[in-house]
Amino acid sequence: IKIQQLVQKRMETQDPNYSAEQSVQLEVSICGDLQMLRGRIDGFVNLSPNIRRIEEYKTTRSAPDIRRGADWGQVFIYGAIKPSFGSIQSTELELVYIHPDTLQETRFSSVYTPAQLDLGFALILLLYEVREERHRERISYRDQLTENLDFPFAEFRPAQRNMAARNYKALVSGEHLLLEAPTGSGKSIGALYPAVKALKEDEKIFFLTARNSGAEAAIKASMLLQAKNSALTTVELTARRKACFCERAGEEKTFCPFSRGYYDRSMSATNELLSLGSAVKSEIEKVAEKHSVCPFELSLDTATWADIVVGDLNYVFDPYVALKRFQDRERFMLLIDEAHQLA
């Protein structure tokens, strides 16, 4: 952010027509639902009454030879949703990579007409809508199967039926429940089964634990449920230092071949993992290596579309490592193993 601010101050000094941090937003229809797209343009310049320039700044120690797809997509969307006034005939989009130590800049730019921006933006929305429609079809099928989802064992263990019933009541009513049960009483499946039964269309289950054994129990329970409901999807989140190929090899992320150009290859990898139903660490690594993408980032992207996410407590409760993409807690059910450890 500091580097970006330095560039913005310099540009404001050099060009009186330059302005920084312009907010943009546009309401769009996705699968019949209205969604609000929001963003902030790093730099904006009216070059003439007919031409404007939109700039996006990225800090990196590894200047790319070509513009990165995801970065260019961002500035392209800004160009498409930035309102045009008067007789604007073209928009110059500029993507600027800045070295944080030397401030050396690598620039990529292209000029588009309003019609070209509109057409490209429509294609982006169409691609996202296809993914969203596929997701909704799976959710609909999942919900149909869940209506008749039986407990995965022939009978409950002692007190397990009452445990599951109490969990279901709490989840449906939005109640916070602290449940104590002895080891070996089947807490994992006793919590996960009613949570799946209570799942609504846009909700997600987070099974949080501080222990490997707790994660293993949660994944085993989810697989038992998936055997009864093939539309359920589960993702296991592993700490970056244990998941990333480059982290384990001691490489800087900036130079990691699995991170560079990640979004150019991630969609097919995410689709493959979702088709498996259960994306545990070993499967994530296998698919990530096949598609040459970062396994940690792949697990996060897959979790965005999954029903059950198994991960460490810190991903929700530690402000330093909490995942920003999962901050809308109203849509999540939290099942916390060893909850007393939070105190």
Predicted regions and their residues:
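Acidic-basic catalytic patches of nuclease active cores, encompassing PD-(D/E)XK
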Residues: 1-28
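Mg2+/Mn2+-dependent nuclease catalytic core
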Residues: 26-121, 191
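Polybasic (Lys/Arg-rich)
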Residues: 114-147
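Walker A/P-loop NTP-binding motif
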Residues: 168-169, 188-202, 221-224
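Walker A/P-loop
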Residues: 172-194
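Signature of the SF2 helicase/ATPase Hel1-core->accessory helical subdomain module
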Residues: 191, 291-308, 313-343
